[in-house]
């Protein structure tokens, strides 16, 4: 399994460099880990069922991080996050869509915890938390940080849109129903996450259409190194680079 994950990282790096999204001397794994160290105060590893809190975080900051990461642990217990992510290896668009549900869930509950406890929280600690890691984004290639940030921000909006749709159109007021639907029948593309009506609304539902590669046999000496599926978010990064 580890070799499969390492191979996926290597293939992603090669493709990003080929498309001009990464400098040729860049190390995708090292850059990603560096960003995570600055951006993330803790994380839950569904593969080992373990939770980690970075050194230097305590008090209110640690509690806010715990609210987010322990949500992942609960979701994993219910929906097997590790199994779902492994099924999506090699399909960047589906992986991004699923991670948006995962991170949207964690972000929502964390924000609810912060709002509920706002009166007793340390204002300075919360200010530090809100800007945590923002400086490191300036030195990180867009192809790394933009999909990561989208999973938090767009994922939260996606789930909120689902609850609104269910309340208005199906008279369902239980906020957990939207989350359960999103996990048991996850969005199939980042397009559906970025435009929630294309997932939640039966009239506007827009599932991705598989494009079958219909090329002739590869010339002698050529071989397929990697195959992947890009969606709206990833293609926007490619066109953004081309326009720049």
Q: How would you name each of these model-derived features?
A:
Residues 1-27:
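A metal-dependent hydrolase signature that marks the N-terminal structural subdomain at the beginning
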Residues 2-7, 27-48:
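Catalytic zinc-binding patch centered on the HExxH motif and its immediate surroundings
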Residues 76-82, 86-127:
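Post-HExxH zinc-binding segment in Zn-dependent metallohydrolases
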Residues 1-11, 88-93, 124-135, 186:
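Acidic helix-start/capping segments at beta-turn-to-alpha-helix junctions
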Residues 51-67, 97-98:
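Short pre-active-site segment immediately N-terminal to the catalytic Zn-binding motif
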Residues 139-244:
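Pan-zinc metallopeptidase signature
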Residues 109-134, 163-184:
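Short helix/loop segments within enzyme catalytic domains
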